[in-house]
Amino acid sequence: VSGLEGKACITNSFQVEDMVVLHLLRQIDPKIPVLFLDTGYHFAETYAYRDRMAEEWKLNLISLQAKQSVAEQEAAFGILNRTDPTRCCGLRKVEPLMRGLEPYDIWFTGLRRDQSPTRKNLRKVEHHTLPTGKTLLKVSPLADWNSKQVWNYITRNGIEYLPVYDKGYPSIGCEPCTSIPEDPNNPRSGRWSGQKLECGIHTFTEKDSPQESQ
């Protein structure tokens, strides 16, 4: 994308932050690859919204899936999102994303510092290395934004948002692992019943020394 060299993509869970970044990127590259982690456990509303926005915005949508279907995984290991959510995320999110990122040099995200204590030191541009040794730039344009700024952008630009937000969820992932936050000051505390704050897709890479501004 403009000012950066290499092949770029964006990971998108169709939450509002991702839609803001995608809205901005489409003004530069309307065909930027949009990587969606299709875990098989998303809300029905998420799938419907994804399909609607993919058609309306003519997205270059790439669905990343685990090697096993939900039925195959549950037959082999039981319902991991209840017994071992970290392993479930590893199989259905981390491993597919690790494969999906290999062709790219630049990875755009909708991460923000105020989303969770685990993200408080997030920089807008970071150098990351995949487990395979592939290096890439991880770019989080909204790192210094807050929730109000995100929603103001959504409203100001008339962007349709995922209807699940209207049920009171400030952070939305797989349906079995999404609930109302236990800590009102930490929107991600409603994920995985408060057992953890990250699924692993933003922690499986090795972060090198950043080169860019805060």
Model-derived regions: residue spans:
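Nucleotide-activated chemistry modules centered on ATP-dependent adenylation/adenylyltransferase
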Residues: V1-Q214
